[in-house]
Amino acid sequence: VSLTRRQTAAALLALPLALTATPALAHGGGGPRGGGHRPRTLHLAGDSTAAQKYADAAPETGWGMALPFFLGPHLGVANHAVNGRSSKSFVDEGRLTALLDGVRPDDLVLIQFGHNDEKTEDPARGTDPWTTYQEYLRLYLKGARERRAHPVLITPVERRRFADDGTARPTHGQYPAAMRALAAEERVPVVDAQALSLARWQRLGPDGTEPLFNWLEPGESPNYPDGRQDNTHFRPAGAVEVARMTARALLEARALAPRDVRRLDAPVPEHLITWPRPA
């Protein structure tokens, strides 16, 4: 599968954030090879909730765009997440192969799918949580391990859904449970973004979560002249929120070491989020 110019441009964002630092190895394996120091990379496979967004979609923001703010300068992020993809279609389109081509020993491979796996009426994307979903996820784990990298499963972040009494509602069915079960079976770390985000949305409530999602008044953004009420995708504040909880969870799971993370409790100004021009 050949990559489009836009996908190639997104891949350029994978360049390490700095070129001089000793790799931090939370897993305790591997050291500098050949006398040199190589920064590690976090490779992200996922869907539109994590994907790089461009100027024609602003202010919609994938949480993968905000993840570098919480990582040390010796870590890079290769954001391969793409709108509309499931664990199945990402593989079938050759995107997993493209991601794995850039993976090196001791890198991390972050895997978050679920939103589009739920679309079981679409044969190109839909999976069954306890069979095909797990089977496809195993391909990501296998590919990472074959390259002596460290896979991490991430349950799908929750949508903004509230019951009439203000209770935040789960929306992903059995997919998070199936991923947690697979993580236990395969003995890989899992970031339970579904549970973490659901609890966070509950604390913030309907009004407090609205600024995190891509809700826009008519005329507020030239990209959405009629406004928008999107309870799935994020604005910068929401992307920062999810990236922060992900970085903290990676630390707690010992997928990252304390020296690998920063700003976990510090504000991140939204103006630091930028959207490249479409390729």
What is the role of each PLM region?
Residues V1-L15:
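N-terminal secretory signal peptides and thylakoid transit peptides that target proteins
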Residues H27-A81, T97-P105, V109:
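Serine-esterase "nucleophile elbow" of acetyl-processing enzymes
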Residues H80-G84, R125-G126:
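Short, basic, glycine/proline-bearing loop/turn elements
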Residues S86-G94:
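Structural motif
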Residues R95-V240, R244-R259, W275-P276:
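Alpha-helical cap/lid subdomain in secreted, periplasmic
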Residues A255-P269:
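Short, flexible loop/turn segments with low-complexity composition
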Residues E270-P278:
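Short, low-complexity, Pro/Ser/Thr/Gly-rich segments in the mature regions of secreted, periplasmic
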